[in-house]
């Protein structure tokens, strides 16, 4: 019995220690709980940052590795695994600069939609559309006693759409047949005068192609006074066809003219060119990475989202812009009114920018990519995280940036040498600014170089001053501030000019009256 006494005493002491420990733990648990929550949140944030950084670095590493492999492979004495034509291989040998490499990858927003926090932001935008619809119904019910949505602005913008779609057919046929036939004529064996005659005929076909694309849309839109949205269809297809046909010839013609010995060369297949005209890229390749199947529910979802963005934009213009700017030209001009109108337009302007980005660069391009099983969905990158305008211009629209980089910047370096980097970059800005201004002039029906000045002058200065050396959240805030102000200036000035030309029409305007802003002198 005696040996059990020490054991009993030890058990009693252990019980007391456990009770004291439990009491102490209960006292400290309430103090440690907030620290544990904060520490958990901190670790989750660190984990998210590490994963995002690792994903970006891995993607860049893989892109670089694939590009280096593609560049190094033709130098070996082995045939390419793809069925690339002789002209494509000759082009790669002639221009050893960095070429666009297509790989299978998702769009960034599709990846971010898998994160619940980002999906909530998407839901907030949908809730904003619902609020606009409710407010429109409430205002119409209070003012006019009816509960019905009117889409007058939408119907006006898309007026005469069938005519615009009819004009698309000859534009498409011209792009489909004439450049490809020109390439076939130039690829014939160079023997005697037959090749010279064929080459001359090819130049005539290209001139006819350029005339159809440049003259027909302008003539139809001016003669029939097409509204803005119908003009958008024509001008975007006009620019797209010109850029695609140029890329097709630019990628194939150099290899053809470098063939020696008077031999002919195998031209790309017609099916590859036809696929290129519809796939969402402006860089021609004979083959692209393809997905295994088509998700038709994904296609329908993207088209529905694009339609929702269109309705969203109409509600924003109808509720936030039209009431403000419709009668502004009837009032005397003042700097105060102009400044207030610009600041008022910053909100609608940035909303329009985001809607255009999401509707076109994400929904529309992804829908066509899915229908055509086009694998490379990197139509944009994380431009919203940019801390410099140079990075913003590179990541906002990757589709157009790739074309400008390949055929304006790199060709400029090839012609001017490495010392001409500044001139090549200036050429990129000049081409982009002129095309943007042409699109605005075509759609709105008047010349008002707001976009030209903002893009070429202000954007060019910001590109060279706010470069990639600047990092940190302050620079991102500054970039967004300039975006807000720039969008406010565009929306305000273009809306004022639109209504001024309707309030103060000129019966027989001269050339200078056509190019002079009417909002500067219209005060009926």
UniProtKB/Swiss-Prot annotation:
One matching Pfam family: MBOAT
Transmembrane helix keyword on record: yes
Membrane topology: Multi-pass membrane protein
Subcellular location: Endoplasmic reticulum membrane
Span of the annotated motif FYXDWWN motif: 379-385
Oligomeric form and interacting partners: May form homo- or heterodimers. Interacts with INSIG1; the interaction is direct and promotes association with AMFR/gp78.
Domain notes: Each protomer consists of 9 transmembrane segments, which enclose a cytosolic tunnel and a transmembrane tunnel that converge at the predicted catalytic site: acyl-CoA enters the active site through the cytosolic tunnel, whereas cholesterol enters from the side through the transmembrane tunnel.
Protein name as annotated: Sterol O-acyltransferase 2
